[in-house]
Amino acid sequence: MTDAKRAQKLDLSLDHKVADMSLADYGRKDLQLSEREMPGLMELIRKYGGTKPLKGLKVTGSLHMTIQTAMLIRTLYELGADIRWASCNIFSTQDHAAAAIAASGMAKVFAWKGETLEDYWWCTEMALTWPDGSGPDLLVDDGGDATLFIHKGVEVENDPSLLKKAYDNKEFQIIMDRLALAYEQDPGRWQRVAAKVRGVSEETTTGVHRLYQLEQEGKLLFPAINVNDAVTKSKFDNLYGCRESLADGIKRATDVMVAGKVVVVAGYGDVGKGCAQSMRGFGARVLVTEIDPICALQAAMEGYEVTTMEEAVRTGDIFVTATGNCNVITGAHMEAMKDEAIVCNIGHFDNEIDMHYLENTEGCVCLNIKPQVDKWTLRSGRSIIVLAEGRLVNLGCATGHPSFVMSASFTNQTLAQIELATNPDLERKVYTLPKKLDEEVARLHLDRLGVKLTRLSKDQADYIGVSPEGPFKPDHYRY
């Protein structure tokens, strides 16, 4: 049964809770190093730092507390925001980045690498709660956990009987315990918080799916901007970011030689495409599993073998899930794998790999090799190596995407926050950023790469029916 006594109480006297404040100077230096690689954010500071469109607004962030995110926080701060921040993954925080932001005073930070699930949801609620008990005006979300917490809070206040139930999912039970404590203290709190939220900008595919589900069900409580499907996010962060950070995570964790290995990539969306390119680039033979005939055909025509997971488990040396779905690699799949196959996930949540099977099946034994690297001996007698407990391998075992590609993503996030802050006419639905802004985000990053852009003549522009200033493609163009 749900029990408020299990939930750790909030401590609103805290300005931060991080692993080690002595890392702040290291974080500050690393932050300076990223500036040149994040031209989009630096330009937004120059453009909007004077007018401060976020002045007086409270912003909650639930997004990986990395050096790149520290630059996003700095940008929002320079635009006038009052910020509280938590990470959106228990393993993704870079402790020196969290310390640097906490020391700077730009945001109240509640994040450290290696949180428990109880810690994680405490940090999320701390980020959603100001010292006077009020909530945010704006949300920056990655995976939708801050949005989920508010929506579940309102749902519980409308139907307190939900708090009398027990839940099989451990993490969901932790959420409900926290909401039970909040309900005991103030049974109308989350309805007041939700009513004040001007909107959320959502960073990733999984969180966007949640938003569209809420919209379709008529349950979305405030406007939302889908940042993930901006071209300069999905076609860059998801593809080129994963192309570099996947290999970084696998190699830091295992020191494995990828060349000559068979790598199985589950899912061939933008993330899967980047993963497949990465592993092929290191000399692996890449197999792809897919449910979508279009993506499957794309993979086949790029030269990848497309097969089922049931077939792939027989030959794979390294497995990467990139689907955003659940139970992609099941217990039966793991039992059939080669001895010491490496299994990891680069989707947002930890349910793509059936960790519940490993943790709850008699005969499955875990040996921790080092942080975020576990050797599981299975009932078959063989072993597999699971990275980051099935959570994001690139952030759990490495430092995530490079600064340059995150500059494009976070420039979109900042523009979305400005839109939510300044447009009072937005309804309770999911919006996307206009093509003109997408092109501007790309334009801001060209000089850093030495790109020289060709300009249309008036005759050429008239011939194809566009302005010489853009936008150059219709909204339905897929890139």
Curated annotation (Swiss-Prot):
Pathway: Amino-acid biosynthesis; L-homocysteine biosynthesis; L-homocysteine from S-adenosyl-L-homocysteine: step 1/1. The lineage of its organism: Bacteria, Pseudomonadati, Thermodesulfobacteriota, Desulfovibrionia, Desulfovibrionales. Pfam families: AdoHcyase (PF05221), AdoHcyase_NAD (PF00670). GO terms for cellular component: cytosol. It is an enzyme of class 3 (hydrolase). Belongs to the adenosylhomocysteinase family. Keywords: Cytoplasm, Hydrolase, NAD, One-carbon metabolism. One of its GO terms (molecular function) is adenosylhomocysteinase activity. NAD(+) binds at residues 204-206, 238, 267-272, 290, 325, 346-348, 394. Its EC number is 3.13.2.1. May play a key role in the regulation of the intracellular concentration of adenosylhomocysteine. It comes from the Bacteria. Substrate binds at residues 66, 142, 203, 233, 237. This is Adenosylhomocysteinase. GO terms for biological process: L-homocysteine biosynthetic process; one-carbon metabolic process; S-adenosylmethionine cycle. Its cofactor is NAD(+). It is found in: Cytoplasm. Transmembrane segments: none annotated. InterPro entries: Adenosylhomocyst_ase-like_sf, Adenosylhomocysteinase-like, Ado_hCys_hydrolase_NAD-bd, NAD(P)-bd_dom_sf, S-Ado-L-homoCys_hydrolase_CS. Binds 1 NAD(+) per subunit. It comes from Nitratidesulfovibrio vulgaris (strain ATCC 29579 / DSM 644 / CCUG 34227 / NCIMB 8303 / VKM B-1760 / Hildenborough) (Desulfovibrio vulgaris). PROSITE patterns: ADOHCYASE_1, ADOHCYASE_2. It catalyses: S-adenosyl-L-homocysteine + H2O = L-homocysteine + adenosine.
